[in-house]
Amino acid sequence: MATLCRPAIAVPEHVITMQQTLDLARETHAGHPQRDLVLRLIQNTGVQTRHLVQPIEKTLAHPGFEVRNQVYEAEAKTRVPEVVRRALANAETEPSEIDLIVYVSCTGFMMPSLTAWIINSMGFRPETRQLPIAQLGCAAGGAAINRAHDFCVAYPDSNVLIVSCEFCSLCYQPTDIGVGSLLSNGLFGDALSAAVVRGQGGTGMRLERNGSHLVPDTEDWISYAVRDTGFHFQLDKRVPGTMEMLAPVLLDLVDLHGWSVPNMDFFIVHAGGPRILDDLCHFLDLPPEMFRYSRATLTERGNIASSVVFDALARLFDDGGAAESAQGLIAGFGPGITAEVAVGSWAKEGLGADVGRDLDELELTAGVALSG
């Protein structure tokens, strides 16, 4: 059975605190008619620190889309190998044992995808399949896990490497002065992550079922306007209330699996902002403690897009992991409005090969019943 192993996380060395963010907002937007509202909204995020791929002075000085994308490519090639090596070590796998690389990022563009460079530069086989995901935004972390799960169900002896590279600060647009844009300037951070999904064995979350849901007629709630100056992030004021629509999706998937949300042991969800976590507590009738890892990611890193779920999961591992067979859920939320959800149980020690194959045969026989 496919197991999501311990993620590797990296953040850039340049740090900006909430106080520095507030001071910059006061100075930069001194005459803005809604400046005080923006300052309150930034404070309410609870984001205390964020990491940036460039010093704040370079981040604020927009050099143009071409230069920014060059920075994206150079920094990705500099920083990705280290998290890939650590993720492989965490899963006790070698590059030659990886059959698919899923690369997720919504903050820069490359063609060919960085997957080609990773394969050529880090000892992966030329036959390694590539799956770049560029347009699912913050939902892409959950989507990557689910597509890796699907692949391992189809090819039970395979291993999948997931890589997330998000330099959100490269999307800063000084001319965007709407309340939503100014709030985003104090919310998003930069990070990289990688994790291996093993088809057999491994310690971590055994992936048992996954599902996807698109909220109808909400595609303009979270979007990019692509202009000469790059990606302009657009956030509708209705976005903070989306958990009222998505919480039932989580409940339904868990119920379909024969489990009950109140009896589950851990939750790793995309912490796009504090309202998401607060509303999930309310609509799922769960105590705030159940989302402590996602909350810590938001507080210490900000919204790091598709890397959020991996950073939060790494915190669960750092805390000793969960008990054997503990029941858990991972969910990513993003543009669409899209939810990508996975449920599974914790494996303290890797399953034996024979047992794993038996479970995989059960998955293939059951089809939807086990894989979403």
From Swiss-Prot:
Broad enzyme group: transferase
Gene Ontology MF terms: acyltransferase activity, transferring groups other than amino-acyl groups
Reaction equation(s) it catalyzes: 5 malonyl-CoA + 5 H(+) = naphthalene-1,3,6,8-tetrol + 5 CO2 + 5 CoA + H2O
SUPFAM superfamilies: Thiolase-like
Phenotype of null mutants: Cells lacking this gene are unable to produce melanin in hyphae, resulting in albino mycelium, however there is no effect on growth or morphological development.
Pathway: Pigment biosynthesis; melanin biosynthesis
Domain of life: Bacteria
Residues at the catalytic site: C138
Keyword entries, A-Z: Acyltransferase, Melanin biosynthesis, Transferase
Cited Pfam families: Chal_sti_synt_C, Chal_sti_synt_N
A Gene Ontology biological process term: melanin biosynthetic process
Gene3D superfamilies the record matches: 3.40.47.10
EC number(s) per entry: 2.3.1.233
Function: Involved in the biosynthesis of melanin but also various secondary metabolites containing a naphthoquinone ring. Catalyzes the iterative condensation of five CoA-linked malonyl units to form a pentaketide intermediate. THNS subsequently catalyzes the dual intramolecular Claisen and aldol condensations of this linear intermediate to produce the fused ring of 1,3,6,8-tetrahydroxynaphthalene (THN).
Subunit structure: Homodimer.
Family that this chain belongs to: Belongs to the thiolase-like superfamily. Chalcone/stilbene synthases family.
Protein name according to UniProt: 1,3,6,8-tetrahydroxynaphthalene synthase
Gene that encodes the chain: rppA
